[in-house]
Amino acid sequence: DIDAMVLRDRNHPSVFCWSIGNEVIERKKLEVITTAKRLAEHVHRLDPSRPVTSALTTWDKDWEIFDPLAAVHDIVGYNYQLHRAESDHERVPSRIIMQTESYPRDAFRNWDLVNKHPYIIGDFVWTALDYLGESSIGRAYYKGREKDGFHTGQLYPWHGAYCGDIDLTGLRKPISHYRDML
């Protein structure tokens, strides 16, 4: 799969880096580091001109467990964890960071960090479009009902993810106008 992707797209002007993973469940296992290193080396053989990244995330307290895995990447992708970047930079000053997924509501704070620190190179918001799947994320709810939905299995009547800038009918949502102002 990596050969096909890199060889097909390596001359495309919109490709600025390659990703070898996203929120790998087994991220704390030693073989994940070995596999990531092999994948990164292989991608570099196919296209030595672009950096390699993957997206890491956890809400555990042991974020530093990612340091050995992060070290095999040219750019370390942070999903929803850009608030850790400044302390991570103190611990690992050579790390280049890119926010690979973030909440739309955090756009201003994240771009403030991007503009402030040269080691943070950008932010990608999840997601541009609402979509079917991950039912109920991004939904509206009544006070006191915050915990119903995606993380509790209480998905009815939700059918889609409502976290995008554009809804399922193609209309822009208010959050998209907020980001235009940034």
Task: Describe these PLM feature segments.
Residues 1-182:
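Extended substrate-binding grooves/exosites of carbohydrate-active enzymes
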